[in-house]
Amino acid sequence: MVCAPWLLAVVVVCVCNPGVGGQCWDSSHCKDLPSEDKILECTHLFRSGLQDESPEPRSAAQQSTEESLSLGILLAALTSGERALDADPEPHSDKRHSYSMEHFRWGKPIGHKRRPIKVYASSLEGGDSSEGTFPLQARRQLGSWEDEMVGALGNQGAKAQTKVVPRTLTVTGLQDKKDGSYRMGHFRWGSPTAIKRYGGFMKPYTKQSHKPLITLLKHITLKNEQ
């Protein structure tokens, strides 16, 4: 691939100057051309040799135009070959996959969920009647399960009947609670005794304890009036 543009450049030079063809291919310089500089040196060498041998004098303008034309064609051929090599270094493999974040929970999207396959007994047995859809063992299991459910429901109903309280009793109990003050008997501090109330420091005075105080107040008022 690398030698192709160089050979193309040599062919272009030979076509532009027909006399160069025979001399260039016979020489050892043109057989092994490792770089672009060698190709340019070879073309300049044989062009100068042809100019010395040719009897027709050429002007400087013609020489410059021919040189620029040949060099332009040579450089265009070389650059096109290099671009082709850079553009396609290796054929792209279709096996290249995108980066999948497998270490994350959302790395791979979940496809369609596998649903359980429903197998009907009618399709297995091939019967059309409703009684023949289930096998004998399945029908026995269903029958025993129904019996257990009926028994459990019966036991629950009997327990509920025993626990039922007459409505009249509940109504009277509610009325009694509304009439009387609610006492928190289920708490430790619901109804403390009179002695232990306020920690025993403030003992309630009895009716007899108030009598001396009342008589004292009466005497004071009588003295003030007199």
Swiss-Prot record:
Proregion residues excised on maturation: 23-97
PTM field: Specific enzymatic cleavages at paired basic residues yield the different active peptides.
Signal sequence range: 1-22
GO MF, one example: neuropeptide hormone activity
Modified residues (N-acetylserine): 98
Localization (cell): Secreted
UniProt entry tagged with the keyword Repressor: no
One GO CC term, this protein: extracellular region
GO BP term, example: neuropeptide signaling pathway
Primary location recorded for the protein, binned into one broad class: secreted
Taxonomic superkingdom: Eukaryota
Assigned keywords, A-Z: Acetylation, Cleavage on pair of basic residues, Endorphin, Hormone, Secreted, Signal
A Pfam family per the record: NPP
Modification sites for N-acetyltyrosine: 198
Family to which the UniProt record says this protein belongs: Belongs to the POMC family.
Protein name, as recorded: Pro-opiomelanocortin
Species this protein is from: Oncorhynchus keta (Chum salmon)
